C-alpha cells in the first residue's frame, strides 16, 4: 500500500515538474531566469502569493519567480521530495512546520544560511522573533526561510458575551475562567456551547504543553536528536485532556473535528469561543457576521509557568539540483521577503505574522495595533517569554502521521470510548513505533 501511494505521488511530482518547471504561460518573460516556487495556498492567500511574486519580478529585470499550487501542505511536501528524487525539484517549496525534521534529514535541501553566504547577501537574522528563528534553526543556523507564520489564539463572540451579561471587552484568561464563562453562556441561553477548537493536536496538545512549559517528546522535543517517544501521557497531558473530555459531556466544550472543521461552529454562533490559528484573523474580519475579539490562550495557572506558544504555518525551503545563476535569483527573492516593509505589507494583507522586530516596530509606530487590536494578541503571546527547551518548538520525524495518531485518540476520548489516560497512552505507544522507525532510517 505504501509503495502504491508513493508511486502515485512520484508520478504526480513528475507531472508537476514537467508543467511547472518546463512550460510557462505566455506572459512569463522568456529572457528572465525562472525561479519555480511550489506553494500550498488557495483562495485569497494564493492571490497574495502571486502578488508577492509579481512585486519581486517588477523590482528587477533578471529573475522571474513563478508560483505553482502543488496541493495541500502534506501533498506539496510529498510531491517536492518525490520530484527531488526524480531530479526535477522546484527551486523553492512551501512546507508546513511539522515537515521540518523530514526536510532537515532529506538530503534534498540547500540551507538558507548557506545560500545567503554563498551569494554574499547579509540578512540580520537576529532581528527575527525568537520562536520563529528557533523553530527553523539547527545549531544556530537558519535552514529555511520563515514565510507564513501563525500561532493559536482564542476568538470570542462579543454579542454572545453581552447577552450572557459577560464583559464583551474581556476574554477569559485561565481555563477556570473558560469553564465559568461557558457555564454563564449556557445558563443565559446565549450559545449552545461554550467553546470549540481547531487543529486539535496543534492547539490542545502541542501548544498546551509549550504554553505550560511541559515536555512534549524526548530529546527536548527532538531538538537534541531524533526523538523516539512522546511525553504527552504525563500528569499535565492527562489533566488537560481529561478536563476537555469532562467538559464535552457538560456541553461546555464541543469537539468540532480536525483542521478547520470547527470554523462554522464558531461563525454560526453555536460555540461562543474558538481556539484556532491567528492566521484566520484576516478572514474573520471579512466574513464573521458578529463582533468578535481575541485573547491569549487560556492557562491553568500554578504550578505551571506561563511560557510562549508555538509557531505554526510554513517556511520556504530551497531545493538542491539547480544552477548557480538560478540560486542567485532565489537568494535575491528571499532577501526581498525579509525586508521589513515587505513583512509589514504581508501581515496587513494576510493576517500572518510579521516576523522581524523592525517590521513590528514599523507597525507599532504607525499605530496599527491600536487600530486593529486583535492583531496584537498573537505577537504578545509569542514574545511574552524567551523560548525554553520545552517551548521553542517540536521537531519530529513523520510528524504528520503522529498528529493523525494523536487526533484519532483524542476523538476516542471525547466520544467517551477511552479515558484520557488510556487514549494518551495508546497515542504514545503508536507514535513510538513511528518515531523509532523514522530514527532507524536515518541512523
Language model segments and positions:
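Extracytoplasmic "Venus flytrap"/periplasmic binding protein-like
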Residues: 55-128, 163-165, 173, 265, ...
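Glycine-centered hinge/linker elements that transmit conformational signals in sensory
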Residues: 179-184, 222-256
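Hinge/lid segment of periplasmic solute-binding proteins
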Residues: 97-153, 179, 206-210, 293-295, ...
Amino acid at each position: 500500500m505504501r509503495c502504491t501511494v508513493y508511486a502515485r505521488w512520484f508520478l504526480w511530482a513528475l507531472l508537476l515538474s514537467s508543467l511547472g518547471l518546463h512550460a510557462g504561460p505566455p506572459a512569463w518573460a522568456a529572457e528572465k531566469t525562472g525561479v519555480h516556487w511550489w506553494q500550498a495556498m488557495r483562495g485569497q492567500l494564493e492571490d497574495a502569493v502571486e502578488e508577492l511574486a509579481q512585486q519581486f519580478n517588477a523590482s528587477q529585470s533578471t529573475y522571474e519567480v513563478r508560483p505553482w499550487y502543488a496541493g495541500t501542505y502534506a501533498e506539496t511536501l510529498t510531491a517536492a521530495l518525490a520530484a527531488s528524487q526524480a531530479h526535477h525539484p522546484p527551486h523553492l517549496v512551501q512546507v508546513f512546520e511539522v515537515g521540518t525534521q523530514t526536510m532537515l534529514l532529506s538530503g534534498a535541501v540547500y540551507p538558507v544560511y548557506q545560500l545567503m553566504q554563498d551569494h554574499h547577501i547579509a540578512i540580520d537574522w537576529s532581528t527575527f522573533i525568537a520562536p520563529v528563528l528557533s523553530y527553523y534553526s539547527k545549531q544556530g543556523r537558519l535552514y529555511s526561510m520563515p514565510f507564513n507564520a501563525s500561532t493559536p489564539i482564542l476568538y470570542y463572540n462579543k454579542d454572545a458575551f453581552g447577552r450572557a451579561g459577560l464583559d464583551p471587552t474581556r476574554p477569559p484568561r485561565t481555563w477556570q475562567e473558560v469553564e465559568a464563562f461557558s457555564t454563564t453562556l449556557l445558563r443565559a441561553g446565549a450559545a449552545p456551547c461554550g467553546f470549540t477548537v481547531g487543529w486539535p493536536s496543534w492547539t490542545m496538545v502541542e501548544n498546551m504543553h509549550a504554553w505550560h512549559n511541559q515536555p512534549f517528546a524526548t530529546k527536548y522535543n527532538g531538538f537534541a536528536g531524533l526523538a523516539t517517544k512522546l511525553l504527552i501521557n504525563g500528569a499535565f497531558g492527562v489533566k488537560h485532556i481529561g478536563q476537555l473530555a469532562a467538559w464535552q459531556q457538560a456541553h461546555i466544550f464541543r469537539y468540532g473535528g480536525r483542521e478547520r472543521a470547527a470554523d462554522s461552529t464558531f461563525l454560526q454562533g453555536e460555540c461562543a469561543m474558538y481556539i484556532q490559528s491567528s492566521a484566520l484573523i484576516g478572514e474573520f474580519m471579512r466574513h464573521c457576521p458578529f463582533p468578535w475579539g481575541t485573547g491569549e490562550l487560556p492557562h491553568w495557572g500554578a504550578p505551571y509557568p506561563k511560557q510562549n506558544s508555538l509557531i505554526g504555518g510554513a517556511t520556504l525551503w530551497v531545493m538542491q539540483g539547480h544552477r548557480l545563476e538560478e540560486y542567485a535569483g532565489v537568494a535575491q527573492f528571499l532577501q526581498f521577503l525579509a525586508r521589513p516593509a515587505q513583512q509589514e505589507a504581508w501581515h496587513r494583507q494576510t493576517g500572518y505574522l510579521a516576523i522581524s522586530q523592525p517590521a513590528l516596530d514599523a507597525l507599532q509606530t504607525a499605530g496599527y495595533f491600536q487600530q486593529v487590536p486583535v492583531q496584537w494578541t498573537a505577537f504578545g503571546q509569542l514574545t511574552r517569554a524567551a523560548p525554553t527547551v520545552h517551548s521553542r518548538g517540536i521537531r519530529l520525524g513523520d510528524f504528520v502521521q503522529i498528529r493523525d495518531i494523536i487526533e484519532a485518540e483524542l476523538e476516542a476520548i471525547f466520544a467517551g470510548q477511552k479515558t484520557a489516560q488510556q487514549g494518551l497512552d495508546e497515542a504514545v505507544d503508536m507514535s513510538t513505533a513511528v518515531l523509532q522507525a523514522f530514527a532507524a532510517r536515518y541512523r
